[in-house]
Structures are given as C-alpha cells and as structure tokens.
Curated annotation (Swiss-Prot):
EC code(s) of this entry: 2.1.1.-
Function text: Together with CGR2, required for homogalacturonan pectins (HG) methylesterification in the Golgi apparatus prior to integration into cell walls, essential for general growth and development. Promotes petiole elongation. Impacts photosynthesis and respiration efficiency by influencing leaf mesophyll morphology and physiology; pectin methylesterification modulates both expansion and positioning of cells in leaves, probably by changing cell walls plasticity.
Gene Ontology molecular function terms on file: methyltransferase activity
Subcellular location: Golgi apparatus membrane
Stretches assigned to the Lumenal side: 51-258
GO cellular component: endosome; Golgi apparatus; Golgi membrane; trans-Golgi network
Protein family: Belongs to the class I-like SAM-binding methyltransferase superfamily.
Glycosylation sites: N171
Name of the protein described by the UniProt record: Probable pectin methylesterase CGR3
Entry annotated with the keyword Lipid metabolism: no
Organism of provenance: Arabidopsis thaliana
Signal peptide: none
Side of membrane Cytoplasmic, spans: 1-29
A single BP term in Gene Ontology: pectin biosynthetic process
Length: 258
C-alpha cells in the first residue's frame, strides 16, 4: 500500500521535482557519489569516537595556534637524554596532559617516569586512567607542597603549568619543584606573544596564561635563590644544534636545592 501512495504522489504532480529526480537517479552517478561521501563521513566520525577522541581534539587545537609546551617536552626527549644522560633515569613531569609525557618517557630504555596533573582529568582516555590507577600519575594542586620526599627524582620537568600561576604562588611552587629533584629541573615556559588560553581553558586553569620574558624568569630565579645549571644548558644547546632542534618554548635549566 505504501508503494501505491508513493506512486500517486509522483503521478499527481504535487511534487514534480521528486518525480524527475527519481526518474534520473538510475542514469546519474550523482546519487552514488553522494552515498559514498556520506559513508566516508560516517567512518571518519566512528574512528574519532574512541578513547583517543579528546587527544585528537587537543592536537588539532595546538596546530591551529594554541601554544603547548607539554607537546614540546615530547619533542625534546631525545635532546634531554643527550644533555642529562643518567639523570633521565627517574623523571617527574609536572603539567597539563602529563599522561602523554609519562607514556612517552616510559617508552625510553632505562627510564622510570611519574607525572603530576595540576588540573581535572575528566576527559582522560584509557591509557591515562591506567596510569592514574597505577599511581604513576597524580592529580594535585601544585600551589601546595608536592606529595614527594626531597630528591625523590633525578630530574623534574615542568611545562605549561607555571604560565598560569601568579608570582605569589610561583615563589612557592618553583622551589618546591627543585626540592624533589636530585640532579636538576627543566622548566618550559611560553614565549611572550604566543596565544593565551581560550575561554574554555579559562574555566579550567582559572586565569589566562601569562607569557613572561626570559629576563623576567632570570630575575625571578635570582630572587628565589635558584641557580641556573649552565653546564646542562650548554649540553642541551649543543644537542639541539646537532639535531637542528629549535624549541618553540623557552627552556630553563635549574640546579636542585641543596
């Protein structure tokens, strides 16, 4: 009965365009092409609907202009290994998206890695949830003392997180990072002029990112009695030059607290 109703609509002339389209669809490849395109879109949507969807979105946002020193850490791992050698054996990373950094470090030979995520991880994928369950990654407010003993790690790497702290909290947090390190601290900070956090990120970080100049950081280190590690800095620059690596973020090397 339904077929008859469809024919009557076409024959009655109420929808002549539908009838014309129906008569031409057999000979025209347009419909087939449209179906293929729709199918491709569905497949792409399915592929991105898995646990890695949030990571893919974050990667796209970085490509479109959002700065990310955490992504820079992963690029710099070979350079850091050349500069620090055995000091890369026990590494603590502090900063947003720490799960991705910890995973990359764990893939390196003779390297143990832990992470501190300063912000919520509601969109954590299965890999990050596994690291949290194992205790390799913790969620902690870095404005307060870190839950580790002094010199627990050979090297501490911090990225992105400090750009969202006011000087009041930096005075406490940076020395605290140096306290839990035995060999050194690597600090990656955004360059002045880089894009600041978007509206959605403001609700997560609490304040826009503050891009400070290298002279500001050097003055800050001096005021907080933190000493730059010139030997490590030189080795890092030499390794970067050999590999044609140009960091997109400012990189500072600090000595641990004695």
């Amino acid at each position: 009965m339904s077929r008859r109703q469809v024919r009557r609509v076409g024959d009655s002339g109420s929808f002549p365009f539908v009838g014309a389209l129906h008569s031409k669809s057999r000979s025209s490849p347009l419909l087939s092409v449209c179906l293929v395109l729709v199918g491709a879109c569905l497949l792409i949507g399915y592929a991105y609907s898995g646990p890695g969807m949030f990571k893919s979105i974050r990667e796209v946002s970085k490509i479109t202009g959002d700065y990310s020193c955490t992504a820079e850490v992963q690029r710099a791992i070979p350079i850091l290994k050349s500069a620090y050698g055995d000091s890369m054996r026990k590494v603590l990373h502090v900063g947003p998206e720490t799960c991705s950094v910890v995973s990359s470090l764990l893939n390196e030979e003779e390297t143990e890695a832990w992470g501190v995520e300063p912000y919520d991880v509601e969109d954590a994928d299965s890999n990050c949830k596994s690291l949290l369950h194992k205790g390799l990654v913790r969620v902690a407010d870095i404005k307060f003392p870190l839950p580790y003993r002094s010199k627990s790690f050979s090297l501490v790497i911090v990225s992105d997180a400090l750009d969202y702290l006011s000087p009041r909290y930096l005075n406490k947090t940076v020395p605290e990072l140096a306290r839990v390190a035995s060999d050194g601290v690597v600090l990656l900070a955004g360059n002045p002029g880089q894009q600041k956090a978007k509206g959605g990120e403001l609700s997560k970080f609490g304040r826009p990112a503050k891009m400070r100049s290298s002279s500001w950081w050097i003055r800050f280190f001096s005021q907080t009695n933190l000493e730059e590690n010139e030997a490590a800095s030189k080795k890092f620059e030499q390794a970067a030059s050999k590999s044609s690596y140009k960091p997109a973020c400012q990189v500072f090397h600090l000595k641990p607290l004695h």
